[in-house]
Amino acid sequence: MRIVLTGATGYIGSSVLAALVARGHDVIAPVRSAASAATATNAGASAVVGDITDPGWFTPLLHDADAAIHLAASRAGDGAQFDGAVADAVIAAFGGTGKPYIHTGGLWIHGPSDDLTEETPFNPPALVAWREGVESRLEAADLELSIVEPGIVYGHGAGIPASLADAPKDAEGRLTVVGDGRQHWPTVHVDDVADLYALIVERPAPAGRVLALSGQSPTVAEIGEAFADGPVVPEGPDASRTRLGAGYADALMLDQQGS
């Protein structure tokens, strides 16, 4: 298949690219810069430099593809506008064609839950409240749509869990963890997420909404202890909001579990 993959040089996207190339797919990687183009090309993609939020540029690229996977994210904090522009191009190019489109969402849209499923109602924190509007537009369009919601992704020394290692330490040298540390994070390895995207794009029918989870939901304190190889201390909600910004901290402090 000829697959357009946005975000092909990102953390998850680079693993998805590797999985697609290994399966023999022809991957077209729209990227922002010549440096990213070189990275994507070296990984086996056909890279093109351009702006995926420009429908005049992105829509024709999609027209020539058999499928598309959207993993790119805005760097400017304007997710609604960024994903909205991508949605415009996808609907224009793929509407009524039967070509598969895989959109990337996220678990945070569901809010706190001790038993997350694809049917869990939306209750998003402010940081990702915009996602519902974009996804509703896509669901209302005539698309062969799948929406993948990755959990807290880890692996290869990166991802949100790895960022705990950079958190401040207290006077006794103990690592501090965001919030009270008792919140659960539903985790998943980046390579497993990549395999899921590849399997979905090859399906004869869309998958609908799919949670990408490992079935393991450790507490943040447990994750921190694994990194620190010793005890950790809670940073506290207010201190976490001050250090990380209220929106991001509140998302990280969600207590979520799922299998």
Tell where the protein language model's regions lie, with residue ranges.
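Conserved catalytic-site region of short-chain dehydrogenase/reductase
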Residues: 77, 107-114, 153-157
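Glycine/proline-rich active-site loop of Rossmann-fold NAD(P)-dependent oxidoreductases
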Residues: 154-165, 200-210
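N-terminal Rossmann NAD(P)H-binding glycine-rich loop of SDR-like oxidoreductase domains
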Residues: 3-25
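A conserved pocket-lining segment of Rossmann-fold NAD(P)-dependent short-chain dehydrogenase/reductase
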Residues: 166-188
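NAD(P)-cofactor binding segment of oxidoreductase domains
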Residues: 57, 61-102
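Conserved beta-loop-beta element that borders a ligand/cofactor-binding pocket
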Residues: 135-157
